[in-house]
């Protein structure tokens, strides 16, 4: 189930959004066998590579603060949370493949939290539901999911996986 969260638009969120949309954030091209390439800035590296999550960006603390403030504003993190991985993903419109492969991010229990920094479309699908994002939307879900390319401009989002206690 996709849960739409209240975005408190805290100072951390506003600064994080500015960083994500800046022209100075280093982005890395991520190729795909299916043709749906994208650009990414890893904030917290996934544990599957080194067996533990670890920050790899100077901006990690800012984005974790924005995540925590959003969870707290929605009464979801009374006992804390753990960010498993986080990155800024940027997808441009393009001809060819329009949908990513359906996938689950980890083989252990987790939820996904997405923050949408642009208003260009690019739906997110989870199980049998879909979310057509607006700028500043925040959603929480678990399960198999995939995304659609935007039809115009660049789709910039925070992608994170969490364990909430």
Description of each model-found segment:
Residues 73-95:
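A short glycine-rich, His/Asp/Glu-containing loop-to-beta-strand
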Residues 113-115, 153-165:
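A short hydrophobic beta-strand segment most commonly corresponding to one strand
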Residues 92, 117, 143, 162-164:
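Short beta-strand segments enriched in hydrophobic/aromatic residues
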Residues 100-103, 146-153:
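Short beta-strand His + acidic residue motifs that chelate non-heme Fe in jelly-roll/DSBH
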Residues 93, 131-146:
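Conserved metal-binding segment of the jelly-roll/cupin
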Residues 96-101, 108, 116-134:
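A short beta-strand-loop-beta hairpin characteristic of the jelly-roll/cupin
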Residues 1-81:
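Non-heme Fe(II)/2-oxoglutarate
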């Amino acid at each position: 189930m996709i849960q739409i969260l209240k975005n408190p638009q805290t100072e951390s969120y506003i600064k994080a959004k500015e960083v994500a949309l800046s022209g100075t954030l280093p982005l890395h091209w991520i190729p795909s066998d299916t043709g749906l390439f994208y650009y990414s800035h890893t904030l917290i590296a996934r544990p599957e590579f080194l067996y533990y999550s670890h920050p790899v960006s100077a901006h990690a603390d800012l984005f974790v603060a924005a995540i925590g403030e959003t969870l707290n504003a929605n009464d979801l993190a009374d006992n804390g949370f753990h960010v498993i991985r986080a990155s800024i993903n940027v997808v441009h419109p393009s001809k060819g493949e329009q949908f990513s492969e359906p996938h689950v991010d980890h083989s252990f229990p987790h939820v996904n939290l997405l923050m949408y920094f642009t208003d260009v479309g690019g739906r997110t699908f989870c199980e049998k539901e879909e979310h057509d994002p607006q700028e500043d939307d925040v959603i929480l879900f678990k399960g198999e999911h995939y995304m659609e390319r935007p039809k115009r401009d660049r789709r910039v989002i925070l992608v994170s996986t969490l364990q909430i206690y």
